[in-house]
Every structure is written in C-alpha cells, then in structure tokens.
Amino acid sequence: MHLNMQEYIWDGIKRDRLVWLGDMHPETSTIGNVFGDEESFYASMDLACQQYPLPAWINGMSAYSLWYLIIQYDWYMRFGHKEYLEKHRDYILGLVDLIDKCIDAQGNDAMGAHFLDWPSSTNTEGVDAGYHALLVWAMQDAQRMSILLGDEARAQKCREVEDRLRRKVVNPNGLKQAASLMAIAGLMDPAKACRDYVSVGGPKGFSTFYGYYMLEALAMDGRYEEAMDIISQYWGGMLDMGATTFWEDFDLEWTRNAGRIDDFVPEGKKDIHGDFGAYCYPGFRHSFCHGWASGPTAWMSTHVLGVEILEAGCKRVRITPHLGRLQWAEGTFPTPYGQISIRHERRADGSVKSSIKAPKGVKVVK
C-alpha cells in the first residue's frame, strides 16, 4: 500500500498511476488503520473533484462517485475533520441532488453503466444487484453527512432516495460481491448472504477488491474464523507464490502447476505473472502492487484486534477481539490523539486477556 502513496493514492504504481476513487475505499481503510491521518488522502479526494466536476461521474463511472460518499464519511469517522466535509460541502450535496434525479419512483436508476469489479463484470444481473446495494449504502452515508453539514433538506432527500431504492427487489444471481454489499446495505440478512452466497465454495469466487466486503459480510454473521481461514487460503495463496505486495487480481486456480514470482519459471510450469491476468490486465500488464487488494489489513484491525469506532475522531472506541484459532494478536491503531496499543492473549480456559493502552482523549468502552 505504501508504494502507492506517492503524494496521491495511486492504483497502481506499476501501470495506471491514476487516482481511482472506487479502488480507494479498501486503500483508505488500510491507510487509516496503519498509517493514520495521511495527506495523500486529502490530495486524492481534492484532485478527483477537480478532475471530475459535477455533473460528471468521478473517473467516468457512477459507482466511483458512490464510493466517494462512502469514503468521505468513513474518513470523517476515523479522524473527525468536519472542516474537510465543509470544504467538500458543495460537491457532497450536489452529488446528492444528481443521484436523486437519477432514481425513479420504482427504485430504478438512470446512472449509466454499472460496475463493481472486473471478475464480476460478466454477471450482469448480479452486478446490477450489487450496484443497487452500493447506491443504498452511499445514500445512508450521504444522509449522515448532510446532517453533519446542517442540511436537513438534503438529509431528507437521501432518506427518500433510499426509500425508493428499497422498493425494488434485486437478485445477486450467485454473485458473492453483490450478496456482500446487500448485507452491508441492509438489503439482505447477513446470515442468508453468507449461507447462500459468500460461504459457498470458501475462497472460490473471492476477488481481490471485493473480497474485503465478503469478509465484512462474514463478520456481520459472526463467521470470524471462517473469514480468517479464507484470508489464509486466498491472500495467503499470493504469499505462497512469493508475493510481497497485494496483487490486482488473483485466482487460486492459477497456482496449479505454476512457478513462484521470486524465481525463474521451472520448465513445464506456468508463469504466475505472464500466463494469467484477464480483462484489461492480461499477462505482464497485470499489476502486482495494487492497493485495492489490501482489505484484509483493515479487516484484521477491525475484527481481530477488534477496534470499532463509536464516535467521530476515535473519541470513543469499543475493542472486541476475535482471535479465531490464534493464540494471541498484537497491534496498534492510529487515532488523532496517538496510537492505541493492543494485545490479546488466549488463556488456558479459552477466555481472552486483553492489554489496552489508549492515549488521552480516547475513551475505550465495553
């Protein structure tokens, strides 16, 4: 992730070298949990709005404008900079107005092409369902920001848009990406999303970008150990092939009879880099340093260390560890007041002993 934080948050340093707003949500979640309040965040958000003034969609993709709203609210909760929301007031509220005009009374949208991630792109019905859930999620966060900005009329508009969207029933069509977003947005019970979609086949059907939201859906259903097993299998599969950075795309099937990236390809084996990839990144065009795949880093801070932000700027946090089969976990969590130091150890009776040191200004609640 750090390699892609060069003044701006790029995805990725090898090829695109562009500020992709959708890619940025796993990235800013990771940056916030590892590096803290980082200037590249503000530079990237400002640049995106300058490059794509309303009524244009950010990066030419309406989904990435939805991610803009989600990212803004998420970062506000982490670091509490209301003045930055004020700086972006016109863009945030203008985007609410633009989206409102695109949603009809039956919950259908006229926002152009729908996109989640590349591996899902051939499942049109599933992508439509996931995009619909992304719209609901974005409107929920836009409503919260409208209230923070003192604009009750816009907040009401967000509620009305969400109500219209909820009138339409969508089908994930077997797509894990869609079911995960539907669980997060409250359009599907997390237990159903995991039982019928996300958990089916374990890591099969996971993707580097949307795998983060699949892990989040599993956590919502209390399936922490299962999520950690999938991290070990899927992202661990990259490590087994010699990865030292997050890859743009990955399929466990690629590892069959493939050589590692840190050695010459043995005769008779596949080149894990040159022989795979897909869509716009076949072969050596495939990026092996892509921040959108970093979701497990953020996920482990939130669910293994167990840090939940309850009040903007980390003024109040709850810490609830989920160790799975781990015997211990240790780490830090950045806040505007300094780092929270955390260590969890499993006792012989299975209970967990926690040692937590929080800076002044951060209240840890049970």
Feature map (PLM): residue ranges:
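The feature captures the catalytic groove of carbohydrate-active enzymes
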Residues: 51-67, 99-163, 171-216
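Repeat-solenoid scaffold signature
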Residues: 202-241
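Carbohydrate-binding/catalytic loop surfaces
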Residues: 14-26, 51, 63-71, 75, ...
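Alpha-solenoid helical repeat scaffolds
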Residues: 26, 67, 71-74, 87, ...
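Substrate-binding groove/exosite segments of carbohydrate-active enzymes
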Residues: 1-102, 106-107, 111-117
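Non-catalytic C-terminal accessory modules of carbohydrate-active enzymes
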Residues: 160, 228-366
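Structural helix-adjacent loops and short alpha-helical linkers that scaffold large soluble proteins
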Residues: 32-45, 76-96, 143-166, 170, ...
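Active-site-proximal structural scaffolding
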Residues: 20, 37, 41, 61-68, ...
